[in-house]
């Protein structure tokens, strides 16, 4: 089965992307990455201390992973662009996850500023994956701006509430012909499986793994869930019906 995910010219086999925040200790991150099978790992640039090898988050991310810095902390397009440029200048490559958040309570993304940042960074050669509220018109604008994918939230960051925006995400999947990667709010493996069954191209998970009792085992559970959900989607889910329908004939065999 030819089922490749291509982003920015890179073939990505694992459809589970992972974040690196909130872990009880950075030293477990390599094991988490290994058990998850993830190829794409995101990290906030503000958590990278380039002057300290011990505290430098990059030390714990396997070298064969695609590093995707994010612009966490940016409150507007200007700040997001500045962080992205700093990440590339620091050797973190061209992949960038745009996060523009000016709302301190719910941490919801500012789609307008995100679109502005995407337009600028795409012109500068970045491979831009913007985190967004799942709005169809804004997703189209991000695509037109050159985004390599869109990353709609399932629920507010860090809440583990699952796919509260399920119907809106499904609209993006149906209408946008660039990858749709569900990001934020995924709280358990079944949430990730559900997103993949909907037809999402990938999911990004951080809090649900990092705050689990055993993050390494949870990473493996998420990996299995993503694979199962993708296979279910590709296989074609059976129709949902209003009334019961017997799987075997109910008449004729007692004559």
Curated annotation (Swiss-Prot):
The gene is thiG. CDD domains: ThiG. Pfam families: ThiG. 1-deoxy-D-xylulose 5-phosphate binds at residues 158, 184-185, 206-207. Belongs to the ThiG family. This is Thiazole synthase. It comes from Acetivibrio thermocellus (strain ATCC 27405 / DSM 1237 / JCM 9322 / NBRC 103400 / NCIMB 10682 / NRRL B-4536 / VPI 7372) (Clostridium thermocellum). GO terms for molecular function: thiazole synthase activity. It is found in: Cytoplasm. Catalyzes the rearrangement of 1-deoxy-D-xylulose 5-phosphate (DXP) to produce the thiazole phosphate moiety of thiamine. Sulfur is provided by the thiocarboxylate moiety of the carrier protein ThiS. In vitro, sulfur can be provided by H(2)S. The keyword Cytoplasm applies. The active site is at 97 (schiff-base intermediate with dxp). It catalyses: [ThiS sulfur-carrier protein]-C-terminal-Gly-aminoethanethioate + 2-iminoacetate + 1-deoxy-D-xylulose 5-phosphate = [ThiS sulfur-carrier protein]-C-terminal Gly-Gly + 2-[(2R,5Z)-2-carboxy-4-methylthiazol-5(2H)-ylidene]ethyl phosphate + 2 H2O + H(+). One of its GO terms (biological process) is thiamine diphosphate biosynthetic process. Keywords: Cytoplasm, Schiff base, Thiamine biosynthesis, Transferase. PANTHER family: THIAZOLE SYNTHASE.
């Amino acid at each position: 089965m030819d089922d490749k995910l291509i982003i920015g010219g890179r073939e990505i086999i694992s459809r589970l992307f992972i974040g690196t925040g909130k872990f009880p200790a950075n030293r477990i991150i390599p094991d988490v990455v290994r058990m998850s099978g993830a190829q794409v790992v995101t990290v906030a640039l503000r958590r990278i201390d380039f002057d300290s090898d011990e505290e430098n988050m990059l030390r714990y991310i396997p070298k064969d992973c695609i590093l995707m810095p994010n612009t966490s902390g940016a409150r507007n397009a200007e700040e997001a662009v500045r962080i992205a440029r700093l990440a590339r200048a620091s050797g973190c490559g061209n992949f960038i996850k745009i996060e523009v958040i000016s709302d301190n309570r719910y941490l919801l993304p500012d789609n307008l500023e995100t679109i502005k940042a995407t337009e600028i960074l795409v012109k500068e050669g970045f491979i831009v994956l913007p985190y967004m509220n799942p709005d169809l018109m804004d997703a189209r604008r991000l695509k037109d701006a050159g985004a390599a994918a869109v990353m709609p939230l399932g629920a507010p960051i860090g809440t583990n509430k699952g796919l509260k925006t399920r119907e809106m995400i499904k609209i993006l999947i149906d209408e946008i012909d660039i990858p749709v990667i569900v990001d934020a709010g995924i709280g358990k493996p079944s949430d990730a499986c559900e997103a993949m069954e909907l037809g999402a191209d990938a999911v990004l998970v951080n809090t649900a793994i990092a705050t689990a009792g055993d993050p390494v085992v949870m990473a493996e559970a998420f990996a299995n869930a993503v694979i199962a959900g993708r296979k279910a989607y590709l296989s074609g889910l059976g129709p949902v019906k209003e009334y019961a329908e017997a799987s075997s004939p109910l008449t004729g065999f007692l004559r």
